[in-house]
Every structure is written in C-alpha cells, then in structure tokens.
C-alpha cells in the first residue's frame, strides 16, 4: 500500500473541505489512506498524489463523488437527538392547531434515520394535516440506503 506524504494529505484536506465543508485533522491520515487505497488500485495509480491529480483533472465527476462518499463519516440512528424531537413535537403541534402545512428539510440526512424519525413525529402530531419531509446529503452512497428504508434493529436505540 502506498504511503501518503504530508503535502498530499494537505491537498486532500483542502479537497474535502472545499467539497463538503469537512475538516480532516492530522489524526485522520490513516483513515483517509484506508478509505482511498482501493481507489488507487482500481485506477492503477501508485501514489495519492496521482489520485489527487485524477480528482482535479475535471474529467471524472463520478470519481470525485466516490472520493467524497468515502471521506464522509455517516453516524446516525433513529431519534438520535431527543431534545430536537421534543422541540419538533411542540412546533408541529402548534402548526397542526392552526391547520398549516408543515415541511421539514433534513440536510446531511445520511442514511435517512433522521428523516424517518421526523416523519414519525409529524404523523403522530399532525395526523391528516399536510406535511412533508425532504432529506439531502452530499454522499450519494448513503442517500441510496435512505431511499431503501431498511434498517437493522441496532439503529433504533
């Protein structure tokens, strides 16, 4: 496996910050190498510098998205932030009492547990009143899992 120089790692730090607003500390160097090493192999590249050049060439948007997917960490589970859902219940109940439609956008929704948690709260609080939940994420890989809506029991803590 190729090793990554400090200069190469610094380029990837800038890349993921520019692409996703994610700051990778120096402690994440091993993680980055582990996640991207198979991409070097897949393209027959010998260095992380070569892989970075591929990403910057502007000729492979799919590979850029793959790199972003690999460098994002997606940890989530149902009802992960209880206080947020308590607040949502209050706001939704107020909107329901005024017969207003309700729309929630879950940015950085990862694999969708938050979206489905929001939907459960809105279904409970708003019943037949109109409501909608929209989820988005920079990682197309996790959005695919969110669309499937199948989760292991461990995601419900």
Language-model-detected regions and their locations in the chain:
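Extended basic-aromatic, gly/pro-enriched interface segments that bind polyanionic ligands
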Residues: 129-157
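Conserved RecA-like P-loop NTPase ATPase core
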Residues: 88, 109, 146
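Short, well-ordered alpha-helices that flank and scaffold nucleotide-derived cofactor binding pockets
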Residues: 90, 120-124, 148
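Conserved SAM-binding loop of SAM-dependent methyltransferases across substrates and taxa
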Residues: 111-128
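Conserved S-adenosyl-L-methionine
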Residues: 108-110, 137
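Alpha-helical elements of the RecA-like P-loop NTPase motor core of helicases
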Residues: 86, 116, 144
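Conserved AdoMet
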Residues: 1-105
């Amino acid at each position: 496996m190729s090793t990554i120089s400090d200069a190469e790692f610094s380029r990837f730090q800038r890349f993921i910050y520019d692409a996703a607003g994610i700051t990778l500390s120096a402690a994440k160097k091993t993680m980055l190498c582990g996640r991207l090493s198979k991409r070097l192999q897949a393209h027959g590249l010998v260095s992380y510098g070569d892989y970075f050049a591929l990403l910057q060439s502007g000729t492979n948007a799919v590979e850029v998205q793959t790199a972003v997917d690999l460098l994002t960490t997606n940890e989530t589970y149902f009802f992960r932030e209880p206080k947020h859902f308590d607040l949502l219940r209050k706001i939704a109940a107020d909107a329901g009492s005024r017969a207003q439609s309700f729309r929630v956008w879950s940015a950085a929704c990862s694999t969708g547990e938050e979206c489905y948690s929001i939907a459960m709260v809105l279904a409970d609080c708003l019943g037949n009143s109109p409501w909608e939940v929209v989820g988005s994420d920079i990682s197309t890989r996790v959005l695919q899992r969110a669309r499937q809506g199948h989760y292991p029991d461990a995601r419900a803590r």
